[in-house]
Amino acid sequence: MSTIIMDLCSYTRLGLTGYLLSRGVKKREINDIETVDDLAIACDSQRPSVVFINEDCFIHDASNSQRIKLIINQHPNTLFIVFMAIANVHFDEYLLVRKNLLISSKSIKPESLDDILGDILKKETTITSFLNMPTLSLSRTESSMLRMWMAGQGTIQISDQMNIKAKTVSSHKGNIKRKIKTHNKQVIYHVVRLTDNVTNGIFVNMR
């Protein structure tokens, strides 16, 4: 199983390499990459099964973010796992935001990686056959409300603007927190911004 790790933190590289080796991946199949240019070349030549990327490698440069977005789109059979660069927050979950793009905390447990990668590790197969989890999506109301919430508007302001009861706003906030698997507003904002950066945003259910 060809794998690429793009993370400037040596501890993370060591941890991921150790995890992959312990799950039977051969050392020669694990490649460390440092730049977006190198990642594009490696993805084209190696067609990796999984790519781990720390968002710090691209998030501060708009052109790098655009290139990462393009690389993800060009390789639908590669699973991209993007680690959030968010400090001092207890969050060890992961979210599938596109069929081949997963946003994860760096605190993800080995057991969770097993759940995600288990079948890919066992068989030389494409990820599309095996990722058995729902893609994160919001209703139109949740999406609109989340944008207002992120713009700093409170429950009463949102209630007035959307012409819905404050209790309904609170209920929608509860749904968003459940879908993004956290009650931490900082994590929610981070997930939204990162998803906006490498995709066209969180899926909105238009029904």
From Swiss-Prot:
Post-translational modification: Degraded by the Lon and the HslUV proteases. Interaction with RcsB protects RcsA from degradation.
Keyword DNA-binding set for record: yes
Residues annotated as domain HTH luxR-type: 131-196
Expression induction or repression: Autoregulated. Repressed by H-NS. Induced by the DsrA small regulatory RNA, which inhibits the H-NS mediated transcriptional silencing.
DNA-binding region of this protein: 155-174
GO CC aspect terms: transcription regulator complex
Gene Ontology molecular function terms on file: DNA binding
Domain of life: Bacteria
GO biological process, one term: negative regulation of DNA-templated transcription
Keyword Iron-sulfur in annotation: no
Key words, A-Z: Activator, Capsule biogenesis/degradation, DNA-binding, Sensory transduction, Transcription, Transcription regulation
Function summary: Component of the Rcs signaling system, which controls transcription of numerous genes. Binds, with RcsB, to the RcsAB box to regulate expression of genes involved in colanic acid capsule synthesis.
NCBIfam families: PRK15411.1 (NF011940)
Subunit structure: Interacts with RcsB.
Assigned protein family: Belongs to the RcsA family.
Protein name: Transcriptional regulatory protein RcsA
Species annotation: Escherichia coli (strain K12)
